[in-house]
């Protein structure tokens, strides 16, 4: 048989397989989520996220040191405040948990890249992502507090903000606030296509951010929709976003691909808590090889078109990249 084309030629050895990889990964493209609890001293394991921790303000640099030891130089900060109220006033307080954490991290590790999550759900006593009018979130009033919160983060030293609230017009409101207060060069990572997903459960337990009534389907996206994600991304581009995001990742690879093809901005994907917890649970039950599944799922997200990935596996993936198992 005279076979001219033999694809197996490029699969014969590890060296040639690595040479011909189409998808390349780097630890520079990994972002590690860090949970900072204002009421905590030291470190406390997160029950709903095995292998992850809450850090107190006195131990948050430990999280940074651990990240750096694996080659991770980017984090996204989530805060758990002592005080919650109807308007989430702790979110923009000068001595708020995120503001203190940012100052502490940047004082100790000025080159470590700190992204802050901007939302109200961890700070409101009702757990919704904005200011309520009855049982509805008032979009435009919420823009005011989101802008105020984002400004307080960058004033404390944050390198980038990531608004996750899904209010209409929030990118424009924050961009205008930054530009008028001397932060025109501070980038915004927009949670552009954030779906009302069932995969957020472990995070909401870890962050204490579950809504006390109702759900978030009135502002987060319907999982049935794909074209709407392009509309949301286009709006964020027009409002001044610097980076777009799709969240969750694994169940929305088609959306990542669509957004990658449609827009030139860098694209982030968030591999959320439920994705992480599923792998952990399946591994604990002896059903899958955790390491291989971790690597394969991350590859699928980058192969779909993501430029960067927020993941609870960031440190482990960085180690896998160093070993040459992926990347």
Model-assigned labels for residue ranges:
Residues 13, 26-31, 38-327:
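Alpha/beta enzyme core
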Residues 1-21:
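N-terminal amphipathic/basic leader segments beginning at the initiator methionine
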